[in-house]
Amino acid sequence: MIKNKTPSVMIATPCYGGQLSEGYLHGVMSVTQSAAKNNYRVHLNTMGNESLITRARNTLVSQFLDADDANPDLFTHLMFIDSDIGFNGDAVSRMVLSGYDVACGVYPRKSIDWERLPELIKKSDKHLEQRALGYNLNFSNPDNIEVENGFTEVMDAATGFMCIKKEVFRKMIEAYSNLKYTSDQIINGKKYGSNNCYAFFDCIIDEKSNRYLSEDYAFCRLWQKIGGKIHVDLRSPLTHYGTYPFAGNVWTKFKIDDEVKVENKNGNDLQQSKD
């Protein structure tokens, strides 16, 4: 738990095109209530119209660090919450008050495991929706998963719901001064002149596995290389919003439906559904 200082969180949200999901909006409204209840402060910072997600994240970090340079007592945590994540404010409180350097939520992938559906339906239709979803989880010790208050250590975690202590960035600046860069961004019509631009969130090829790592997994590796740990909250429910295409062909439906047969004028049998 955090002691001797009231936590203060900058919620950082990349929102390309200025778009936010309904669940995100409800979550932001909810977190103000949860923060007041749990005695910490929140400030919302968004970045629209930056198509490069890596640069958006690094810029939001630089703004967090700029604010800290101006007033070291202003923020204790930066929390990335992506605009397509639906959440409850208490999930944010669990991250902030956990005491972990990096604490993350786990949300479903934007996919449905269609191949498993027949098997799942045969077993039981209870919780079918949840069983058909997939999650990106890479436990640090899969043979002995230790859970404390719903949190466990992992190798990788997504940035879409990630709470990071300020001290993490200060340690990384000291360890990775070579990652500092000069920004060429134009923000609000002006050249962005922050002195705190570091490529902490950038895609890499992992040295050991040769895997291509996204910017969130790459950040995890940088932090782990200097002795840091990543924890995830297994208890807090999250929603991952996406655009699902309901693609259909009514002719195909007739052909595969076994309920009622009809004959078309060309002589081919069709199947007609009763509903």
Write out the residue ranges for each language-model feature.
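Short beta-strand-to-loop acidic/aromatic patch adjacent to the donor-nucleotide binding site
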Residues: A70-G86
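Short, conserved alpha-helix that lines the donor NDP-sugar binding/gating region
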Residues: I53-N71, R221
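Conserved catalytic core of nucleotide-sugar-dependent glycosyltransferases
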Residues: N88-C203
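N-proximal low-complexity "stem/linker" segments adjacent to membrane-targeting elements
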Residues: M1-R55, D269-D275
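C-terminal catalytic/acceptor-binding lobe
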Residues: N4-P7, E174-D275
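Alpha-helix termini
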Residues: T32-N39, L65-L74, Y176-L179
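Anion (oxyanion) recognition and catalysis
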Residues: A36, V96, W223-Q224
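Short, Asp-centered acidic motifs that coordinate Mg2+ and/or phosphate
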Residues: H77, D101-V102, I230
